[in-house]
Amino acid sequence: MKEYQVYLERDRSRQQDFLYPLIFREYIYGLAYSHDFNRSSFVENVGYDNKFSLLIVKRLITRMYQQNHLIISANDSNKNPFLGYNXNFYSQIISEGFAIVVEIPFFLQLSSSLEEAEIVKSYQNLRSIHSIFPFLEDKFTYLNYVSDIRIPYPIHLEILVQILRYWVKDAPFFHLLRLFLYNFCNWNSFSTPKSTFSKSNPRLFLFLYNFYVCEYESIFLFLRKKSSHLRLKSFSVFFERIFFYAKREHLVEVFAKDFSSTLTFFNDPLIHYVRYQGKSILASKNGPLVMNKWKHYCIHLWQCFFDIWSQPGTIHINQLSEHSFHLLGYFSNVRLNRSVVRSQMLQNTFLIEIVSKKLDIIVPIIPLIRSLAKAKFCNVLRDPISKPVWGDSSDFDIIERFLRICRNLSHYYNGSSKKKSLYRIKYILRLSCIKTLACKHKTTVRAFLKRSGSEELLEEFFTEEEGILSLIFPRASSTLQRLHRNRIWYLDILFSNDLVNHE
């Protein structure tokens, strides 16, 4: 128990002070206002204008200095107590400023943990969406049961602020944060991805949501480490950046005194946890009994610690060999491969059946076709159609738009074990591009291709990937052919294409 107490004492020393003065720095709001809102992958794009005006920021700072932040007029509820008018505009800038300031201590902690783990160079690859799939290929073939968990949401804003206080020691900062949340959103309501608060304040909402998930995972992984002597080195970068606060001391003492036998029963060195897009996967080699124990632990953790009601029926436990789970735009399951080997010993011949497991990752063709139909590239019968709204663009811009979509889908789904579905998607986009060009020139598809000779240009839909791989492996044709059959994971994909988000 002493090593846990030392760890907690060290974490308390890293708490940050004096964030409140940073709220009134001009450059904070300059960074906030020039932030690219369209890079958000969790909430819908809000579409703010990214023009920057230092004069507007200076006026904002001046008016914030002149206001008395401790007095709220109850008779004038429609008027902004901070600035008097244009509440939505200033709410957006102030919330972005809050998010930038509060991200500073967590960024410093993450940077120090990366330096201690000596994996700064590989941090960019760990941010990739595809970095999760090589881990699944290495680990999931040895596991038997999987549990799909949807992280419960919403959570009350007051609970988030209280949890945040254990990380940052700055009372004026949190008073101002509470005042801001009270005036610019409904304090008694819950924060959800589709709420007005999350749409108008995307960066602050994303920070609060990610902080809530980080807090939940820190407790979950703390007990995971406590219940096993083996460390999960595969995800050390994510574990090392999680810091515990003084509130855990009581938790450590309780589990050490009263629940030691229970934790021994939980001991499972082959349990793995993966989180993605508000969901998580818990997989284990042991039977369903241990998985049920972890399931009920998660439910009690959400109900008791975060005051979120969650029912046991929302978490399903399935056998990997008989269940396909939807993961980041893929259908994934563990397939059993059976092979028969003939063995001969003296005059006797034996037939030995060997069963091996392989992670099968497939492109979900039906949801992807549905996304193409929703984007008006084809109809519900999978027949390509033209895109008349792009008719005002030049031929080069139209072809470039289709190629960009095809390129993004090709890169994202190149890890599929069966690529025939991907070729079908390329075929639909290719014909949709041809029909769009023919509709623009008011002619038929056959006449357009015959007149303009665009067949060679449109072959880029199928030859671009081959050209990229030929540059990487210029002298190995056999290697190139093998790469087309195998999976290729790209470690530079930070945001998924809009057509991929069909879950």
UniProtKB/Swiss-Prot annotation:
On whether Lipoprotein is a keyword of this UniProt record, the answer is no
UniProt main location, coarse? plastid
Q: Where is it localised?
A: Plastid, Chloroplast
Q: Name one GO cellular component term.
A: chloroplast
Q: Which GO-annotated molecular functions does the record name?
A: RNA binding
Which GO BP terms, alphabetically?
Answer: mRNA processing; RNA splicing; tRNA processing
**InterPro entries associated with the record:** Domain_X, Maturase_MatK, Maturase_MatK_N
Transmembrane ranges, per UniProt, are none
Q: Which UniProt keywords apply?
A: Chloroplast, mRNA processing, Plastid, RNA-binding, tRNA processing
Does the keyword Zinc feature in the UniProt annotation? Answer: no
Q: Which family does it belong to?
A: Belongs to the intron maturase 2 family. MatK subfamily.
* Purpose of the protein: Usually encoded in the trnK tRNA gene intron. Probably assists in splicing its own and other chloroplast group II introns.
**Protein name as it appears in the record:** Maturase K
Gene from which this protein is expressed: matK
